[in-house]
UniProtKB/Swiss-Prot annotation:
It is found in: Cell membrane. Residues 61-64, 128-148, 206-223, 284-324 are cytoplasmic. InterPro entries: GPCR_Rhodpsn, GPCR_Rhodpsn_7TM, MRGPCRFAMILY, Proto-oncogene_Mas. One of its GO terms (cellular component) is cell surface. The chain crosses the membrane at residues 36-60, 65-86, 104-127, 149-171, 185-205, 224-244, 263-283. This is Proto-oncogene Mas. Keywords: Cell membrane, G-protein coupled receptor, Glycoprotein, Membrane, Proto-oncogene, Receptor, Transducer, Transmembrane, Transmembrane helix. The gene is Mas1. It comes from Rattus norvegicus. Interacts with AGTR1. Interacts with FLNA (via filamin repeat 21); increases PKA-mediated phosphorylation of FLNA. Residues 1-35, 87-103, 172-184, 245-262 are extracellular. PANTHER family: MAS-RELATED G-PROTEIN COUPLED RECEPTOR, PROTO-ONCOGENE MAS. Expressed in platelets. Signal peptide: none annotated.
């Protein structure tokens, strides 16, 4: 396998190792401060999402929205774990053996898998909430009871397919011209899927959601849920979306965009780590902030007053959604 087809971390590792081996007796180049910041933020985000996942799975009753949040938390955990290990690996500067190379590639591909899944899940959340506002009767009375779990399973499968294509055609391909053309085709496909399908769906549904909520006072009682959705999407578009742009450009223009790659990874780390903070601050009461239990805060943040009726009984919400 040609070394030039490594993922970004692997390529940086190879370049870094070769330069150090060529300059014996000199001091090692300093580790970019970006990696130190990533190594500081990612463990915090990993723990936050782990606590959130535990509450969602074992301490809280589920509704359609929390099923999506559960899967989003799993995607964030996988992303943060991989980027933390990759940053440590870069800092320790191990020799790039064949086995080590495959470990780096596996972590990098898993990182992309978590990133792609996060984009797809956020789009699904935005679209479903938009439908619940546009068609409230359908949402409350006719929505399939396992729709959230089914959609999440489909999106995980789509993310797996897209990530596998990116790995096979762009990361693990050779220098041959047909391999490069295949990679360009995959880049175009991912760009269309990300920027002409999912991102526009997210933006349009979010815009409709905001307009409808501003016009209807009946939505005020569940405004925290909508605030959670909107803030999460805005943070994703600001911090995480640039990474996908740079990753696609990276395959063709490493010399131009390679230096910006670490910054994009830092932004993606911030995005995945910020989600639990968003849920906490939106769900907490201003007068009782830091004095309420986390379960109460999360329940308030994820409360869905438009929850389908078949999920309610005797005035209490009954969990029927399952996490795949």
């Amino acid at each position: 396998m040609d070394q030039s087809n490594m993922t970004s971390f692997a390529e940086e590792k190879a370049m870094n190792t070769s330069s150090r081996n060529a300059s014996l007796g000199t001091s090692h180049p300093p580790i970019p401060i970006v990696h130190w910041v990533i190594m500081s933020i990612s463990p915090l985000g990993f723990v936050e999402n782990g606590i959130l996942l535990w509450f969602l799975c074992f301490r809280m009753r589920r509704n359609p929205f929390t099923v999506y949040i559960t899967h989003l938390s799993i995607a964030d955990i996988s992303l943060l774990f991989c980027i933390f290990i990759l940053s440590i690996d870069y800092a320790l500067d191990y020799e790039l053996s064949s086995g080590h190379y495959y470990t780096i590639v596996t972590l990098s591909v898993t990182f992309l898998f978590g990133y792609n899944t996060g984009l797809y899940l956020l789009t699904a959340i935005s679209v479903e909430r938009c439908l619940s506002v546009l068609y409230p009767i359908w949402y409350r009375c006719h929505r399939p009871k396992h729709q959230s779990a089914f959609v999440c399973a489909l999106l995980w499968a789509l993310s797996c397919l897209v990530t596998t294509m990116e790995y096979v055609m762009c990361i693990d391909s050779g220098e041959e011209s047909h391999s490069q053309s295949d990679c360009r085709a995959v880049i175009i496909f991912i760009a269309i899927l990300s920027f002409l399908v999912f991102t526009p769906l997210m933006l349009v549904s979010s815009t409709i959601l905001v307009v409808k909520i501003r016009k209807n006072t009946w939505a005020s009682h569940s405004s925290k849920l909508y605030i959670v959705i909107m803030v999460t999407i805005i943070i994703f578009l600001i911090f995480a979306m640039p990474m996908r742009v740079l990753y696609l450009l990276y395959y063709e223009y490493w010399s131009t965009f390679g230096n910006l790659h670490n910054i994009s990874l830092l932004f993606s780390t911030i995005n995945s780590s910020a989600n639990p903070f968003i849920y906490f601050f939106v769900g907490s009461s201003k007068k009782k902030r830091f004095r309420e239990s986390l379960k109460v805060v999360l329940t308030r943040a994820f409360k869905d007053e438009m929850q389908p009726r078949r999920q309610e009984g005797n005035g209490n919400t009954v969990s029927i959604e399952t996490v795949v």
